[in-house]
């Protein structure tokens, strides 16, 4: 299992949006420049974040993007699903029913689920629950507590200086 680079772009971009003053938006160009990434790909990432209700686009001359929810209400899982979609990592094709040693494929019913499927789905659910338990707010607070004061001041100044 591997997430696309879009997930990383989303996390790093949203991280800095936490510091934006209220009613302040930020454009794709500024976010791309901040993170040293391509505007075109980041635009696609933000389109997905908007469709998921994580960010909101504000039209007009002073338009751009802003967070659409409180940072406590944006989980890691929300961000991943917005970018990657809600698919499961493992899809059981029930090949055990085709095994040459199986006399009757009908013995494999819901009473006898594939143990491989059960174990992997349990692991997936544990991972999803772990990702649901961490929010954008948690990420921001955890990372920023170790930032030196001059770095925090630089981020705040950058946030205030964004032209919208």
Which residue ranges define each predicted feature?
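Beta-hairpin "wing" of winged helix-turn-helix
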Residues: 54-62, 66-68
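Alpha-helical residues within the helix-turn-helix
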Residues: 33, 50-51
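A short alpha-helical element within helix-turn-helix/winged-helix DNA-binding domains
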Residues: 28-36
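Short amphipathic alpha-helical interface segments
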Residues: 13-22
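Short alpha-helical segments that sit at the start of domains
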Residues: 1-14
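Short, hydrophobic-biased segments on the C-terminal half of alpha helices
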Residues: 46-47
């Amino acid at each position: 299992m591997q997430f696309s680079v879009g997930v990383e772009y989303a996390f790093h971009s949203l991280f800095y949006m936490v510091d934006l003053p209220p009613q302040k938006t930020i454009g794709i160009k500024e976010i791309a420049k901040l993170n040293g990434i391509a505007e075109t790909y980041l635009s696609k990432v933000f389109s997905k974040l908007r469709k998921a209700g994580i960010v909101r686009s504000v039209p007009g001359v002073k338009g751009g993007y802003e967070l659409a929810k409180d940072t406590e209400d944006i989980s890691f899982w929300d961000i991943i699903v917005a970018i990657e979609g809600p698919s499961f990592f493992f899809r059981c094709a029930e090949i055990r029913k085709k095994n040459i040693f199986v006399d009757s494929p009908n013995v494999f019913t819901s009473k006898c689920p594939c143990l491989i499927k059960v174990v992997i789905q349990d692991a997936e659910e544990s991972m999803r629950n772990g990702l649901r338990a961490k929010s954008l707010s948690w990420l921001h607070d955890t990372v920023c507590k170790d930032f030196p004061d001059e770095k925090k001041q630089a981020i705040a100044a950058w946030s205030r200086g964004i032209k919208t």
